[in-house]
Amino acid sequence: MVSFKNLAIVTLAVTTTSVEGISFSNIYLNKAITIFKNPTSLIPSFSNSKLINYQNTKPIPGDSPIEVCDASEKQLLHLDEVIVTPNPPVAGQNLTFTAVGTLDKTIEEGAYVEVEVRYGFIKLIHQTYDLCEEIVKVDLQCPIKSGKQTITKNVEIPEEVPPGKYLVVARAYTKDDEYITCLTATIIFPVQ
């Protein structure tokens, strides 16, 4: 199963070590499925509306919906490329996420990530997580050494993902509140 929290965290982890996002956890997907028992009926209400757009974003080279947000602010992580296959992600299919980036400073225990996930204008998640606890789920661990790294992760996306537009934003900080990165992605799952 998939959770957008982990999409954001994996994106960070994959981009933090090279550098998000993508391993998803069941909790929030199940919450979304519960909220939207008949998601198909919700699609028209979002089709003409815009998601909340974050200003000051910068595209990341490669084939991915992920962008750097708060791009004018100094960040410790610099992404060279992020590739998501297939792009856009497809419910019921495997997703491959590859990221290449450089980390200016080693990330130690105490680092954290603030994650927000919206379905259209509906906020599904707004929580803070221990980054070092979460990256274990994507085969990484703290300390995350500075320097250039490449990471590839395969994830299964469940068929039960409600169709619609999802906005994922993740802001990561060191234990001393230095800005590691801000990543955002708009993901659209079409009606099947």
From Swiss-Prot:
Alphabetized GO MF terms: phosphatidylcholine binding; phosphatidylinositol binding; phosphatidylserine binding; sterol binding
Propeptide section residues: 22-56
Key word Cell membrane present: no
InterPro entries the UniProt entry points to: Ig_E-set, ML_dom, ML_PG-PI_TP, NPC2-like
Signal sequence annotation: 1-21
Keywords: Lipid transport, Signal, Transport
GO cellular component: a single term: fungal-type vacuole lumen
Alphabetical list of CDD domains matching this protein: PG-PI_TP (cd00917)
Example GO biological process: intracellular sterol transport
PANTHER family referenced in this protein's UniProt entry, alphabetically: NIEMANN PICK TYPE C2 PROTEIN NPC2-RELATED (PTHR11306), PHOSPHATIDYLGLYCEROL_PHOSPHATIDYLINOSITOL TRANSFER PROTEIN (PTHR11306:SF0)
Family affiliation: Belongs to the NPC2 family.
Record function comment: Catalyzes the intermembrane transfer of phosphatidylglycerol and phosphatidylinositol.
Subunit structure of this chain's protein: Monomer.
Record protein name field: Phosphatidylglycerol/phosphatidylinositol transfer protein
